[in-house]
A protein has these predicted regions:
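Classic N-terminal secretory signal peptides
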Residues: 1-15
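Post-signal/leader-peptide non-cytosolic segments of secretory proteins
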Residues: 14-103
């Protein structure tokens, strides 16, 4: 029985440290709220209630949220739906950047 457990463990594909990091950041990303407003000149401003741990991803999350609003998402539910649809793309870009920086 113990040998079977070790055999199964050996057959499992190894998860890279980058993939582990993406999973952790993805979980954090799902718990972040963005607050968007406009300054006195009518420019959009964005702030996050916490960080994903990656400043570039945080910036992209704000840009994505603003883009959703500019594209017509009105109300929290519509904005959330729009942003959630873009999160896989944000994480894919982060994954490429992390792989590139560690090669």
């Amino acid at each position: 029985m113990i040998a079977a457990v070790f055999l199964l463990a050996a057959l499992q594909p190894a998860v890279s440290p980058i993939e582990n990091e993406i999973v952790v950041i993805g979980r954090r990303l799902n718990s972040i709220s963005a607050m968007v407003g406009k300054d006195q000149k009518g420019r959009f401003t964005c702030s996050l209630d916490k960080s994903s741990g990656n400043i570039n991803l945080d910036k992209r999350l704000c840009k994505t949220t603003v883009r959703c609003i500019r594209d017509g998402a009105i109300g929290d539910s519509a904005i959330k739906t729009c942003v959630d649809a873009e999160k896989p793309k944000l994480l894919a870009k982060l994954r490429r950047e992390l792989k590139g920086s560690r090669e």
